[in-house]
Regions:
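Histidine-acidic metal/acid-base catalytic patches
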Residues: 1-7, 11, 15-29, 61, ...
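N-terminal small/glycine-rich loop or linker at the start of catalytic domains
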Residues: 1-8, 66-74, 110-114, 221-224
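Glycine-rich, proline-tolerant flexible connector loops at the mouths of alpha/beta enzymes
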Residues: 34-60, 110-113
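Active-site acidic/histidine proton-transfer and metal-coordination neighborhood
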Residues: 19, 23, 54, 59-62, ...
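Conserved beta-strand positions in the central sheet of alpha/beta enzyme cores
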Residues: 34, 69, 104, 146, ...
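Residue-level detector of anion-binding/catalytic polar loops
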Residues: 31-32, 66, 101, 144, ...
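Short, small-residue-enriched loops and turns at beta-alpha junctions
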Residues: 41-43, 74-79, 110-112, 151-155, ...
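The substrate-binding groove and active-site-proximal loops of carbohydrate-active enzymes
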Residues: 73-82, 234-236
Length: 280
């Protein structure tokens, strides 16, 4: 089992620098890291311009760490295709320098319904040409492109399955990043979604949420499509049924990495790592 430092690594990388980020991940006991940036980035420059991938690879190797998957959050894959592809291709080159096997990327980064939102079929048609070009470039660099349940369109069993079917009409090799919490945004059980997509799972994101219904004004969180409030909590203490999800993956023979996607102090992070080790 490989445990991957996700949120903590990226917070360290952008706030404390490359050396601190790598050393902290190693000190916490992680086996690797998962870089993340957005397109368009909200930072002064994208990650591939701020940090030299070869230097990062050297530091990772020196600390016994790997980078099996790199994540890329595209806000709207259906708009500005040339800009999306230019930035994404450069990120793929960055990921390849790190030796990544997988690129996970979003297509429509939204955890709330879009105003005047098109139908699922309309959005799928809009994102598909750009998505396929990204898959092609990944394959040219020896990487597999992954999609996770995310947002208000390509989420849940039908949302992800429909995307996979459409892309596989031309590129059969795409897979799934099994996020163990995101399907709650469309009111579907992470356990059910993981079970449905488990044969395609190549990478896993671990997080947990409390489901609060009716929502409480004193708690910070997001609202699901059906109005349930989703509040971040410690791994294993929420409503994602993580122990069952991890057991399901283990029993299915999943042998990939588990990426810890939480914002937490070191003790809470270590407890999350222990939870995954004990249940996965």
């Amino acid at each position: 089992m490989k445990l991957i430092c996700y949120n903590q690594f990226n917070q360290d990388l952008f706030h404390n620098g490359m050396a601190r980020a790598v050393e902290h991940a190693a000190a916490l006991g992680f086996d690797g890291v998962e870089p993340l940036d957005m397109m368009p980035t909200h930072r002064a420059a994208p990650i591939y311009e701020m940090f030299d991938a070869r230097e990062l690879r050297r530091r990772l190797d020196g600390n016994g760490l790997c980078a099996p998957c790199c994540s890329w959050a595209i806000r709207r894959c259906d708009r500005d295709a040339d800009a999306v592809l230019d930035a994404t291709y450069r990120y793929i080159e960055f990921a390849a320098e790190l030796g990544a096997s997988y690129l996970h990327h979003t297509l429509v980064l939204s955890v709330t319904p879009l105003p005047d939102a098109p139908s699922y079929e309309q959005m799928l048609s809009a994102v598909l040409p750009t998505a396929k070009k990204i898959v092609k470039r990944c394959e040219e660099y020896g990487m597999q492109c992954l999609y996770e349940p995310q947002g208000m369109f390509f989420n849940g069993i039908a949302g992800v399955s429909g995307l996979l079917r459409a892309v596989r009409e031309e590129y059969a090799g795409v897979g799934v990043c099994a996020d163990l919490g995101n399907s709650l945004f469309v009111d579907e059980s992470p356990l059910d979604v993981t079970a449905a997509l488990i044969g395609d799972a190549r990478h896993v994101h671990v997080k947990d949420y409390l489901c609060i219904n009716p929502p409480r004004a004193d708690l910070k969180g997001h609202l699901s499509r059906g109005g349930v409030q989703l509040v971040d909590c410690r791994v294993g203490e929420g409503d994602c049924r993580l122990a069952e999800c991890l057991a399901l993956l283990k029993n299915a023979g999943y042998s990939g990495a588990y990426s810890i996607e939480i914002d937490a102090d070191d003790d809470t992070t270590r407890r999350a790592m222990d939870f995954v080790r004990q249940n996965g």
